[in-house]
Amino acid sequence: MIFPITAYIEAALGLARYDKLEDGSFSGEIPKLKGVAAFGQTLRVCESELRSTLEDWILVGLRLGQKLPVLAGIDLNKVQHGRLATT
C-alpha cells in the first residue's frame, strides 16, 4: 500500500528538472511547487537534497494550512475519515 503523501512525493519528483552548473555542481527544482529547489555537488546529492526540501515544504505547508497543488490526482489538502483523499 502506498500512502498518498508518498505518492505525492514521487509524482512531484517526476516533475523535477535538473541542470548542471558551470562549476560542475547541480541545481534541481520542481517548477509546479514554488520554492522547491536544491543544489548539490553531484546529481545524486542534488536529488537527495531536493527530496528533503520537498518533504519539508509539504510538512510546513500542511502545518500552516497553505493550499498545496494537486499532483497526479492527489490532493493533500483534503482529509476524509482521517485519511488523505484522492481525486
Residue positions per predicted region:
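Short, charged, surface-exposed hinge/linker loops at domain edges
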Residues: M1-L15, S48-T87
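Exposed, low-complexity/repetitive linear segments and helix-based recognition motifs
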Residues: A7, F26, R44-C46
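Structural detector for hydrophobic anchor residues on beta-strands
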Residues: G14, F26, V36-A38
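Short aromatic-glycine-(Arg/Gly/Cys) micro-motifs in beta-strand/loop hairpins
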Residues: Y18-K32
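A short, exposed loop/beta-hairpin motif centered on an aromatic-Gly-Thr core
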Residues: K34-V45
